Swiss-Prot record:
This is Tryptophan synthase alpha chain. Tetramer of two alpha and two beta chains. It comes from Pyrococcus furiosus (strain ATCC 43587 / DSM 3638 / JCM 8422 / Vc1). Pathway: Amino-acid biosynthesis; L-tryptophan biosynthesis; L-tryptophan from chorismate: step 5/5. Signal peptide: none annotated. GO terms for cellular component: cytosol. The lineage of its organism: Archaea, Methanobacteriati, Methanobacteriota, Thermococci, Thermococcales.
Amino acid sequence: MFKDGSLIPYLTAGDPDKQSTLNFLLALDEYAGAIELGIPFSDPIADGKTIQESHYRALKNGFKLREAFWIVKEFRRHSSTPIVLMTYYNPIYRAGVRNFLAEAKASGVDGILVVDLPVFHAKEFTEIAREEGIKTVFLAAPNTPDERLKVIDDMTTGFVYLVSLYGTTGAREEIPKTAYDLLRRAKRICRNKVAVGFGVSKREHVVSLLKEGANGVVVGSALVKIIGEKGREATEFLKKKVEELLGI
């Protein structure tokens, strides 16, 4: 889904509004190997405070699911950069799995990551996604055993998303040793590309993870924090942060 060495920015759809999200995506497009677009949810348990607050801001401002598809559709008028929706299962359930995935495909979505859908319960979802032409992305954590990592890789048609730490998302000072241990195991076991996320906030994080074999690195909280502070005026600050991460 993306070339090796890619930075994969994450933004929450509708924070602070749909047009601003589109503007941010277009501004970051030249730096991105792929883009993760989060679907706001009222109980984002896998996310840390920064991204939780972005979900709440979007919902408070009246976000509706159709706005995420509008953002992707408008983005597709300008770019072919792959977009992966990152969502909890509830919005999919409410819309209906096939309806959700069909609309996602029609808007130009390439892949989907359902944060709270365990791989062992994802067979039907994965089959429908394949029928609709949407690639699936699954999470693996530092405590994921090799056998489960193999199942995750087998169910994945996009890339395997390696969670660098235990707990929720959020920028950290250091990437823990357990993240590198997981990355080495994944490179040995997985046939799909792997991207590492959760906690990436510095240039040295990106460099060390790519050097260790990650195909891509996801950065979310460090960008979402800027949007929380700058709102609609965040564009140039986002670009500056991404350039810092890439060493430009």
